[in-house]
């Protein structure tokens, strides 16, 4: 196939809906862990890394919350407690409210 076509659905990349379909099938869990020296880390897990670009999502979340973070396996870890705003920010990104569990 040409480089302008999606290898999964066969549509042009501009019309590709694979990532939206993948977002609808995710079950996302958001929790806060306490690390060394009392530091809090918000952990967002339940993503399928083969269907969603976690590095792009991590960059988006870090800029929205103005914090540092990383991708470890199929989870995104953000420095600080962002539990209260995480659901609305993920909904802005295209995930539905039913998929996100605190």
Swiss-Prot record:
Regarding protein family, the annotation reads: Belongs to the SUI1 family.
State whether keyword Protein biosynthesis applies: yes
UniProt KW keywords: Protein biosynthesis, Translation regulation
Tell me which PROSITE patterns the record gives: SUI1
Superkingdom field = Archaea
An example Pfam family from this entry, by short name, is SUI1
**Protein name, entry field:** Protein translation factor SUI1 homolog
**Secretion signal, residue range per the UniProt entry:** none
* GO terms (BP aspect): formation of translation preinitiation complex; regulation of translation; translation reinitiation
What GO terms are given for molecular function? mRNA binding; translation initiation factor activity
